Amino acid sequence: MLERMNRRNFLELGVAASAAGLIPRGLAAQTTAVAQRAAQASADASATPIQITNLYDNVYLLQGAGGNMVLQTGPDGNVLIDSSFAPAVPRIREVIGTLSKNAAAGPGILINTHWHSDHTGGNEGLHSAGFTIFAQQNTRTRLSTAQTLKMFHVNTPASPPGAWPAITFENALHLWRNGDSLDMVHFDPAHTDTDIYIHIHKANVLHIGDVWFNGFYPFIDEGTGGSIGGVIRAVETALALADTSTKIIPGHGPLGSKAGLQKFHGMLSAVRDKVAAFKAGGATEEEAIAKKPTAEFDAVMGTGMMSPDNFAGLVYRTL
């Protein structure tokens, strides 16, 4: 998501944002740390091994430096969900070559769950290798134009044309590939306004992208349509689709289940309700954060990309 900025940019960003009053001064260093972590993950992507988990006969979870990917193989060709960071493309292609059930069928289809570059950074490289990119229309719009990452107060340039989805949809698109049916469905704005889920029916696999950060407080992109309420509604949609055997793929973190997603929903709802009550009572963002609305969850959820205070601030601002 932030791979085109360097470490010095991030340090300057945190200082400038705090000085300008764009974010509470106490959160500036934490915001900078989040950005630095994302940049480092991108830089390390070429050297980060991809872990493979077999989800079904011909469906695999691929986990590397960026967002979680899913690969379906078979006689109709490969279907890959998300493309990690650009430097990861050689490793991704190597894994696909190893797992592919029918190399003669060609590279196949790449589906983006949303627009952030830890999920779309490999688009251009995989497109050059022959993949056709599918996504919700807003993903093409955001990849093809300059964007602002509001939390980090930074503008990002448009991605190269080769990274743009060639086939887009507004609400839903259905595919039949390799003996299974795949639904691609647009969530209402949630983590961003580009989020979709991909449901692979026979395999009982549901990829929900960054609607779920499994084991961590989520990042919500408030500048591109994200909100706490939207994330909660999207999680509820996913829960309605899943059964106790569904393999639910989060954008980040380990393979999930319906029970795990239910716990995530409970956390989101509890923090939202507390922050909403503080805000309704007249608390400023800094005052609401100081009341520690996430405290009961911090031991489990507070060690990831988003600090408890950063997450509480996002909740406050997107209510």
What feature does the model see in each segment?
Residues M1-S18:
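N-terminal secretory signal peptides and thylakoid transit peptides that target proteins
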Residues L11, V15, A283-L319:
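C-terminal regulatory/interaction regions
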Residues A16, T98-H174, D193:
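Active-site HxH/HxHxD metal-binding segment of metal-dependent hydrolases
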Residues R25-L62:
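C-terminal segment of N-terminal export signals and the immediately downstream linker at the start
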Residues Q51-T98, I196-I200, V205-D210:
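Conserved beta-strand hairpin/beta-sheet module of binuclear metal-dependent hydrolase folds
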Residues G77-N78, F85-P87, H174, S181-A270, ...:
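Metallo-beta-lactamase
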Residues I81-S83, G108-W115, F134-Q137, H207-G209, ...:
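Active-site neighborhood of phospho(di)ester-bond hydrolases with catalytic His/Asp-centered motifs
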Residues G97-K101, W115, S128-F131, E236-D243, ...:
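Sec-exported extracytoplasmic/periplasmic mature domains
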